[in-house]
Design a protein with these regions (language model features):
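Flexible, solvent-exposed loop/hinge segments and secondary-structure transition points
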Residues: 2-194
């Protein structure tokens, strides 16, 4: 006996599924277009707040174009328009991925503050890099050889020593590398007269 192929049994579910997929795609496109602006505005607001956190004496910030860096460093200006420092975003590889750090450096070469913008380190270990007690270790004049990590119980370097987070030396090294990269960019910017 020959079985008959019924086109209605195939076309109807296929058409229904296609219509559902088109409606869902349209809904996602509308949602994306509606939320894209507010999300961008929130990101800009968060970045400005982070800049203010790492260089609180600044009244405004001005991006420095064409530095060859992946993120544009910013001049920090006081209310009179004088440069009081620079805000530089850098990153380095940590244990759980990239650690993105924003560093504020005053014109005299003193780190005014750092904040961790992004990290995916282990909770309770490497994620402690966001704690103020760790970040405050960087609040000093940038040493000639940059910052370096030492473990608790070891002799701290004379200057520029950053005590590693307990059981998170890789993360500690990542933050130090990112801050050291920011200090290198700072040195380049200040030599160039920016």
């Amino acid at each position: 006996m020959k079985s008959k192929f019924n086109w209605k049994e195939v076309i109807r579910p296929t058409a229904t599924l296609t219509i559902i997929c088109l409606l869902v795609t349209a809904a996602l496109a509308v949602t994306n277009s509606v939320t894209q602006g507010p999300i961008a505005a929130l990101a800009t607001q968060k970045e400005l707040a982070s800049r203010q956190q790492v260089l609180p004496q600044a009244a405004s910030f001005e991006e420095i174009p064409d530095t060859g860096e992946t993120t544009s460093p910013c001049k920090a200006l006081d209310s009179a328009g004088n440069v009081v420092g620079y805000v530089i975003v850098t990153s380095a590889n940590g244990y759980g991925g990239s650690v993105k750090v924003m560093t504020g450096i005053q014109t005299d070469g003193t780190v005014a503050g750092i904040t961790i913008l992004e990290q995916s380190e282990t909770v309770g270990l490497g994620a402690n890099c966001e704690k103020e007690s760790f970040r405050n270790q960087f609040l000093q004049t940038v040493p000639d050889n940059g910052f370096s990590v030492y473990k608790a119980g070891q002799n701290a370097p004379e200057n520029g020593g950053i005590e590693a987070l307990t059981s998170a030396t890789i993360t500690s090294n990542a933050v130090v590398k990112a801050v050291n990269r920011a200090t290198e960019i700072f040195a380049t910017l200040t030599k160039g007269g920016n």
